[in-house]
């Protein structure tokens, strides 16, 4: 099934799931995750973490890059949080005060994103909505790469209806 690109609000999507990209280290939501958490407070993958310092969580409370968190939502589409970047911000902008050496380059983030897509396919969704330029705003990714990965993933899973929302 071909990817559909629509002008519209991702939070009003009629897909079974919507996907947002999240980082593993932050304590607070930013960008789209902040908008989602404001609308649906129970959908905040940062709220369960333990603070290390400032906006940094402890190593023990961080999700693994390439993993997802699934939030069921009675008030809208279910939300998939794709942990496709380790450190918040653009690659190389911050140094982890916990001293971890987990790769967080643009290349590593793109690989984490593709790992998340593989995990999402395992959910056997009927339809998935993505924000236009996922991974490319605050995270600094390249849309041509990310769109290419979504296109390839969609072609490999024709049973999944994929919609990209230009917010």
Residue ranges and their predicted role:
Residues 1-167:
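Macrodomain-like recognition of ADP-ribose-binding/processing modules
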């Amino acid at each position: 099934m071909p990817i559909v690109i629509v002008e519209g609000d991702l939070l009003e999507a009629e897909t079974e799931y919507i996907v947002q990209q999240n980082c593993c280290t932050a304590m607070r939501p930013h960008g789209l995750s902040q908008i989602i958490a404001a609308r649906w407070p129970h959908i905040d993958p940062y709220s369960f973490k333990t603070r290390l310092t400032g906006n940094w969580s402890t190593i023990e409370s961080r999700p693994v890059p390439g993993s997802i968190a699934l939030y069921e939502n009675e008030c809208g589409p279910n939300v998939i949080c794709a942990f496709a970047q380790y450190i918040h911000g653009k690659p190389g902008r911050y140094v982890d005060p916990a001293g971890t050496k987990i790769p967080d380059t643009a290349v590593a983030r793109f690989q984490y994103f593709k790992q998340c897509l593989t995990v999402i396919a395992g959910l056997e969704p009927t339809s998935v909505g993505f924000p236009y330029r996922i991974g490319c705003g605050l995270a600094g990714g390249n849309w041509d790469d990310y769109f290419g990965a979504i296109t390839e993933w969609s072609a490999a899973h024709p049973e999944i209806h994929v919609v990209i929302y230009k917010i």
